[in-house]
Amino acid sequence: LQQSPASEFEAVTHMSLKDHIKYFSRYHGLNRQDAVFFNQSDLICDMAKKEDFIIMGRCADAILTNNGIPHISIYITAPIEQRIQRAIEVNSGLDRKKARHFLKKLDKKHAHYYNFYTGRSWGNANNYDLCINSASYGIDGTVDFILRMIGRDKDKKKSE
């Protein structure tokens, strides 16, 4: 008995970690990181075809674009000093030097991952529908701004 793509997707989303690793066997011969990337790419596409959702990172902008799936792609940034301050606020015991080092290392890791799997430059404004500096609006203001933009996009699509 063959499962429909939707029921297969439902089954995959409810698997244990051990079962997910077995499921990766369809990417036989790939290293684990590549298998994870291609598996999550399939999941992102399947989810995007079924419903609206928010995903942070995972090269979702490129994955959805390359698969012709309509989406809104947003890149949020802030000056390094504000990011350091925020990192200190949410991670007790982190001093400025460690926070700066952590963020620089994280940015480098994100850029490498994104560049490797997409062939694009991470953070390049041409890759996104909207780029926003959260320092200009604060966290809550940035969220409100994005929600208004998404609402306008949905209203526009309804009227077409």
Regions picked out by a protein language model, each given a short descriptive name:
Residues 153-160:
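C-terminal helical "lid" subdomain and adjoining coupling/linker elements of P-loop NTPases
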Residues 47-50, 57, 63-67:
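RNA pseudouridine synthases
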Residues 7, 11-22, 95-140:
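Small-molecule kinase domains that catalyze NTP-dependent phosphoryl transfer to phosphate-bearing small molecules
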Residues 41, 139-147:
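Short, amphipathic alpha-helical "lid/cap" segments that border enzyme active or binding sites
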Residues 60-61, 77-83, 137-138:
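Conserved nucleotide-binding/hydrolysis micro-motifs of P-loop NTPases
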Residues 67-90, 96-105:
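Conserved phosphate-donor/acceptor-positioning beta-strand/loop module used by diverse small-molecule
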Residues 1-52:
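ATP-dependent small-molecule kinase phosphotransfer cores
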